[in-house]
Design a protein with these regions (language model features):
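Alpha-helical scaffold segments
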Residues: 1-265
Length: 265
C-alpha cells in the first residue's frame, strides 16, 4: 500500500468503527468497549442500546480522557444511576469540577472511600472531607463511631471537637488522629472531666508532654490527674502551673503539695 492510500484506509476503518459504536446492538457494544479510540467511545455514548452495566464496564478503563468522562457525566444515565456517579467519582481522570458536583450524591461511607482512593487529588480529598463534615450534625451516633475509627484526620478532628464521650475511644484509637487535634480539644470549650480523663488514661497519649501540660492547665481536669502527672513534670513546669490563673482552688492545692514535696516554697 502506498503512503497516499494509508490515510484513506485508516479513515475508512475509523468510520466503520464509529458507525458500529453508534448502531451496534447490546452484544455488539461489548466488542466496542476496548476500542483504543476515544472518538469511537464517545460515539458509543450516543448508542441507544447503552445501559448501566455497559457504562460501568467502560468506566473501569483507566485510560479514559477528561473529555470522554465529561461526556459520560452529561448522559441522562449518569443522572439516574447512583453507581455511575460513584464510578465517575472514583475515576482518577474525572475533572475536579465534575467530582465536586457528584460528591453530594454519594452516601456517607462512599465519601470515606473517596478519601482513601489511590491517586485521589488533594482537592478531591478535601471536598469529600468537607461533604462528610457537613453531614455530621444529622449523622446517627453509630455511624459517627464508625467514622471516628475509619475516617481521615480532619474528619476525626471534627468528631473530637464535638466532645461526645461516646466518641472518644474511637477517635483516640484512630491511627490518623493528630496530637494537635487533642491539644486543641483540651484547650477548647467542649472538654469535660470525663473526656479529659479518657485522654489522660489512654496508653497512646498519656505520656505526651504537651498533652500532659494541657490536661493540667484545664480547670475541668479531675484532681487525680494532678496526683498522677505532677511528679513526672520538670520543676519549672510545676512552678508555671502554680502561677496559672486557670486552675481551681483544689488543683492549686495539688500543685502546692507537689512543690512542698520537692522542698520548694
Amino acid at each position: 500500500m502506498s503512503d497516499s492510500e494509508k490515510p484513506a484506509s485508516l479513515d475508512a476503518d475509523l468510520s466503520r468503527r464509529l458507525y458500529r459504536a453508534l448502531t451496534a446492538d447490546r452484544d455488539g457494544i461489548l466488542s466496542v468497549l476496548n476500542d483504543p479510540s476515544m472518538e469511537v467511545l464517545r460515539s458509543l455514548l450516543k448508542n441507544p442500546n447503552l445501559d448501566e452495566p455497559i457504562l460501568l464496564t467502560l468506566l473501569k478503563r483507566m485510560d479514559l480522557t477528561e473529555d470522554t468522562l465529561t461526556a459520560v457525566s452529561r448522559l441522562p444515565l449518569a443522572g439516574e444511576s447512583h453507581q455511575v456517579k460513584v464510578a465517575l467519582v472514583h475515576h482518577p481522570a474525572t475533572p475536579a469540577r465534575i467530582v465536586q458536583t457528584l460528591l453530594p450524591h454519594l452516601y456517607l461511607f462512599e465519601l470515606v472511600t473517596v478519601c482513601f482512593l489511590p491517586g485521589v487529588t488533594p482537592d478531591q480529598k478535601v471536598a469529600a472531607e468537607r461533604a462528610i463534615i457537613q453531614r455530621l450534625p444529622v449523622t446517627p451516633l453509630g455511624n459517627k463511631i464508625t467514622l471516628a475509627r475509619r475516617a481521615t484526620s480532619d474528619v476525626v478532628d471534627a468528631l473530637l471537637q464535638e466532645g461526645n464521650p461516646q466518641l472518644m475511644d474511637a477517635c483516640l484509637d484512630n491511627p490518623r488522629i493528630r496530637e494537635s487535634s487533642l491539644f486543641r480539644f483540651l484547650n477548647g470549650p467542649t472538654a469535660t472531666a470525663e473526656t479529659i480523663s479518657t485522654i489522660a488514661r489512654h496508653s497512646r497519649w498519656k505520656n505526651r508532654p504537651n498533652l500532659k501540660l494541657a490536661i493540667l492547665k484545664n480547670g475541668r481536669t479531675p484532681q487525680i490527674w494532678f496526683t498522677v502527672f505532677l511528679p513526672t513534670l520538670p520543676l519549672v513546669e510545676v512552678k508555671n502551673l502554680r502561677a496559672s490563673g486557670r486552675l481551681t482552688k483544689g488543683q492549686k492545692e495539688c500543685v502546692e503539695e507537689e512543690l512542698k514535696r520537692r522542698g520548694v516554697r
